[in-house]
Amino acid sequence: MRKKRYLLGEIYKYCVNFDVQLIINNDYNLASLYEGSGVHIGKRDLPIKLIKSVIGTDRLIGFSCGGEIIDLNQLKENGISYYSIGAFAKSLTKTNAEELTQETIKKYCDNNDLPMCIIGGLDMSNIESAMKYRPNMIAICNGIFNQDKDRIKETIKKFQEIIDAKS
């Protein structure tokens, strides 16, 4: 745990330096330790009101919908800041995640009153397809880090160019 907190502290400093908000997955207690950081939760996590009582009401709280259709109005009423849907494609990070159907993605796009994040299996082969749905955010893991270390920076630049062109 000490190493985890040290590494997170270093990541937090990096985020502050580049004016990027740190979002911590599931661990709202950990998020409460870093000013301005947010937390991303799922259906099985504690009630949103309890999480807000720990981290504060001004923090971002994201919610994973997975592939289910969730009532976005209820999420908004409960104080969710954004939601994510996925997996967009086969994911190496969450191997048990089912791929979204186009119909499910379109339903979310049509009912989109909250910022939407597309997550899961995004890489150079499908990022343009994902961007056609005009998400507010995307989450990429293996599409960046599942390659030679010396190509990561170049890959991030390519993703950024595609995202900027489609935004």
Regions found by a protein language model. Give the residues of each.
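Conserved alpha/beta-domain cores
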Residues: 2-12, 16-28, 32-34, 38, ...
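Alpha-helix-loop-beta-strand connector modules within alpha/beta enzyme cores
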Residues: 4-23, 51-66, 98-124, 158-167
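Generic signal for short, ordered secondary-structure residues
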Residues: 9-10, 30, 87-88, 109, ...
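Catalytic cores of alpha/beta
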Residues: 22-37, 67-81, 111-112, 116-118, ...
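Glycine/Thr-rich beta-alpha phosphate-binding loop at enzyme active sites
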Residues: 34-36, 41, 63-106, 110, ...
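Short, charged N-terminal helix-start/capping segments
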Residues: 46-55, 76
